[in-house]
Regions:
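Short beta-strand scaffold positions
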Residues: 56-57, 124, 145-146
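Active-site-proximal alpha-helix that buttresses catalytic centers in soluble enzyme cores
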Residues: 3, 8-73, 117
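Domain-level recognition of soluble alpha/beta enzyme cores
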Residues: 161-184
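Short active-site segment of divalent metal-dependent hydrolases/proteases
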Residues: 13, 150-151
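Active-site signature of alpha/beta-hydrolase-fold catalytic machinery across serine-
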Residues: 68, 153-157
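Glycine-rich phosphate-binding loop signature in dinucleotide/nucleotide-binding domains
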Residues: 46-50, 133-140
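Generic beta-sheet signal
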Residues: 5, 140-148
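Phosphate-handling substructures
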Residues: 69-125
Length: 184
C-alpha cells in the first residue's frame, strides 16, 4: 500500500518575525502564524484531504500549528521531529549564525562547538522518525508538523540534493511525499 505523507512547517512565530534563531527554544505563534494554520486547514478541507494519523514535533509552535490546522483531533508528539538544536545561538539574531558558518554549509557543523547538534545527528533522527512513522502506521494519509531546518534536511536527503544546496520552506508550507513501504 502506498502511503502519503504531508510534512508541514509550523506557522510564523515571534522569533521568525524578529529574525531570531529558535532551535530547541520556543516562541509563540504570531497572529499571522495562526492565520497560516487556519489557511492550511481550509486547504485540506477544500482538497478533501483527511488524515489517518497526525504527528507533531513536541515544540509548542508545531503543536499549536497542528491544533489550529486539524482541531480537536488526537495526535502524537514525536521527539525526533524537533528543530535542529542550535546551542548557544538560540534566541540570538540569525545574522550572528550566518557570520560564523562556512560558505559551503547551510549550518553544517558550525554550531557543534557551541553546544549545538551536528547536521548528521539531525538528519539521522528526522529520517528515523519519518520512516518509523510510515512503517508503523496502518493509515494511508499522514500529516506531520515540524520545522524549517529539519524538513529542509529531509527533503534534500530524499531528493538527493548536494549537501551544500539550499532548500527553504516557508511557514505553514507543505511538502507531499508518497511512500511505497521502502522509500519516499
Amino acid at each position: 500500500m502506498v502511503k502519503t505523507l504531508y510534512l508541514m512547517r509550523h506557522g510564523q512565530t515571534v522569533f521568525n518575525l524578529k529574525g531570531k534563531i529558535q532551535g530547541a527554544s520556543d516562541s509563540p505563534l504570531t497572529a499571522l502564524g495562526v492565520q497560516q494554520a487556519n489557511a492550511a486547514q481550509q486547504y485540506f478541507k477544500t482538497k478533501n484531504i483527511h488524515f489517518d494519523y497526525l504527528y507533531s514535533s513536541p515544540q509548542q509552535r508545531a503543536r499549536d500549528t497542528l491544533e489550529n490546522t486539524v482541531p480537536n483531533q488526537q495526535y502524537w508528539c514525536v521527539k525526533d521531529l524537533k528543530e535542529w538544536g542550535f546551542g548557544l545561538f538560540e534566541g540570538e539574531s540569525i545574522e550572528l549564525l550566518r557570520a560564523i558558518k562556512q560558505p559551503k554549509y547551510l549550518y553544517g557543523d558550525a554550531v557543534v562547538p557551541f553546544e549545538g547538534e551536528s547536521r548528521s545527528e539531525v538528519e539521522q533522527r528526522v529520517n528515523r522518525a519519518l520512516y518509523e512513522m510510515m512503517d508503523t502506521t496502518d493509515g494511508e494519509t499522514i500529516l506531520a508538523v515540524s520545522h524549517g531546518s529539519t524538513i529542509g534536511l529531509f527533503v534534500r536527503n530524499i531528493l538527493g540534493y548536494d549537501r551544500g544546496s539550499k532548500f527553504e520552506i516557508g511557514n505553514c508550507n507543505i511538502v507531499k511525499f508518497e511512500y511505497d513501504g521502502e522509500e519516499f
